[in-house]
């Protein structure tokens, strides 16, 4: 049985890994509030702008992998691998790559009636969306939640989720996004 620290997204904890992506040793534990601060802060602003100026896909992928810090939204890890999960956060990050209209996708997901968005931001490349939602692991496991959510967004919105999100240790690169959405329960303003 996977240990879950809490079912309260406010208390969810997950691992932070400094770049590059082949670094599998986390340096600290973060919260959604910490991730919001990082994404809206200046840590990744220059590298996000630089990545978006790169025209070659292969070069852009290499740049992202060497320059961007990342988190594992679904939990705390002793090492960046599924079998090194310490505890699940109760969060799931769904990645939508190469969408035609980022603003429209964000609007649809924020208006969803079934899933309460915890964090929503534009991907480092600028043409994708990262959607972090709370899941209840007492109902089913991480992989089943991912499959259900992927099927749901495809049927409801015609969106295709990146299938790698099925892995609990999936890396999520942290870009700069001044327009990131954070649930008001996480950061009340």
Model-derived features: positions:
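Signature for HUH/AEP ssDNA processing cores
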Residues: 1-127, 135-143
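Helical (often loop-to-helix) elements that flank the catalytic cores of nucleotide-handling enzymes
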Residues: 105-108, 135-159, 182-189
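Residue-level detector of short coil/turn "hinge" positions at structural boundaries
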Residues: 116, 160-161
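Short, conserved secondary-structure transition motifs
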Residues: 132-138, 163-185
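Detector for Asparagine
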Residues: 7-8, 22-23, 151, 167, ...
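Short C-terminal domain-edge/linker segments immediately following a structured domain
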Residues: 123-127, 161-166
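Short, glycine-/Ser/Thr-/acidic-enriched flexible segments
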Residues: 99, 179, 188
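Generic detector of isolated residues embedded in canonical secondary-structure elements
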Residues: 93, 128-130, 148, 173
